[in-house]
């Protein structure tokens, strides 16, 4: 009996994240080994091929480690799926301004997409798919800290920023960095079955149960709008978050009308004032759950809420975890 071979194409380019390429390749190799132990004659073969649309023989990754033995793409690539890695950059919108650098990658991605090849992108690699026009009209996710910039530059993409992974047709996108492992476990399950994916997950200590980026979002790391009104808003909310805050009170403090304030929030924060205040209160609750032994009722009070059950629902909606589960998962970071 001929064993099935699944070929994963790993797109290499200068400044890419090494783990975006090596992580999936290692996981597939582990899966193949486990499969051969379980069923020597029927286990699927996984082949990982590092290639360059520019026919480069070597690339220097973000960490400074060079990758050699890179294959040229060729005119008729035989990949079952192609993965676009995360790319080094310092600001969320930087790749938009550097888009002219990636024309060879765009051309290759469009060509493979037209031929029906499945394409996946992880972390900031999702930006390349969007810049190539492959995500227009599709559901997608990206690194949570890039979501604001992504939404502004690609309004035709149906962004699900809290999702860890989104599969829409022949296109798969994942969130930040290690979300690539959720993708590769899904891939192993599709090719070799759920049991093989679970065994690989256990062998490599990978969490195959993660569904959302929401628990990891930090407002402190998000891009801040550069505007004098935004600075007034930030200063006021930092000082008053534990108190009751109305749109009228916030507008009065900032010296603007409620209507202008609403427009400013939609344009710069992508949400309403109430939605943004709720985000900040959840952020404060996360910090208190991580770093203190306060009871949940005490946390709720310090976040400006008086209704603990209501805030509990808000917290779970925003983070996908209950407050108790969040504290259990993240409290060790404070020790």
Question: Predicted segment positions?
Answer:
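N-terminal functional module of multi-domain proteins
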Residues: 2-130
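A conserved active-site-flanking secondary-structure segment within enzyme catalytic domains
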Residues: 136-162
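Amphipathic alpha-helical segments enriched in hydrophobic/aromatic residues interleaved with Lys/Arg
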Residues: 153-191
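Short, Lys/Arg-enriched, Trp-marked, Pro/Gly-tolerant hinge/linker segments that flank
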Residues: 163-174, 191-235, 239, 252-253, ...
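Basic/polar phosphate-binding segments, predominantly the helix-turn-helix DNA-binding elements
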Residues: 232, 236-239, 247-280, 300-325
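Short helix-capping/hinge SLiMs at alpha-helix to coil transitions
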Residues: 239-243, 291
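Short, basic, alpha-helical segments at the C-terminal edge of helix-turn-helix-like DNA-binding modules
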Residues: 277-286, 325-335
């Amino acid at each position: 009996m001929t064993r099935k071979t699944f070929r994963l194409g790993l797109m290499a380019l200068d400044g890419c994240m090494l783990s975006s390429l090596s992580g999936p390749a290692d996981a597939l190799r582990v899966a193949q080994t486990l499969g051969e132990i379980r069923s020597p004659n029927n286990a699927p073969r996984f082949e990982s091929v590092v290639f360059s649309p520019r026919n480069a023989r070597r690339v220097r990754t973000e960490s400074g480690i060079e990758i050699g033995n890179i294959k040229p793409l060729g005119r008729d690539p035989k990949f079952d799926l192609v993965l676009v890695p995360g790319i080094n950059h310092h600001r969320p919108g930087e790749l938009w301004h550097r888009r002219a650098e990636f024309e060879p990658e765009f051309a290759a991605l469009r060509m493979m997409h037209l031929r029906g090849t499945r394409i996946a992108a992880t972390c900031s690699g999702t930006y390349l798919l969007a810049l190539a026009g492959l995500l227009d009209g599709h559901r997608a996710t990206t690194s949570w800290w890039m979501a604001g910039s992504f939404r502004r530059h690609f309004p035709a993409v149906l962004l699900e920023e809290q999702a860890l992974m989104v599969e829409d047709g022949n296109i798969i996108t994942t969130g930040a960095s290690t979300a690539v492992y959720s993708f590769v476990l899904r891939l192993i399950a599709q090719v070799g079955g759920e049991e093989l994916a679970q065994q690989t997950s256990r062998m490599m200590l990978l969490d195959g149960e993660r569904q959302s980026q929401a628990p990891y979002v930090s407002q402190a790391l998000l891009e801040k709008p550069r505007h004098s009104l935004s600075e007034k808003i930030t200063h006021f909310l930092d000082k008053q978050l534990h108190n009751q805050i109305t749109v009228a009170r916030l507008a009065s403090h900032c010296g603007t009308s409620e209507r202008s304030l609403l427009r400013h929030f939609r344009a710069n924060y992508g949400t309403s004032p109430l939605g943004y205040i709720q985000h900040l209160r959840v952020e404060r609750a996360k910090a208190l759950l991580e770093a203190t032994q306060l009871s949940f009722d005490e946390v709720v009070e310090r976040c400006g809420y008086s209704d603990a059950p209501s805030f509990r629902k808000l917290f779970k909606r925003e983070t996908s975890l209950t407050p108790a589960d969040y504290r259990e998962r993240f409290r060790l970071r404070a020790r």
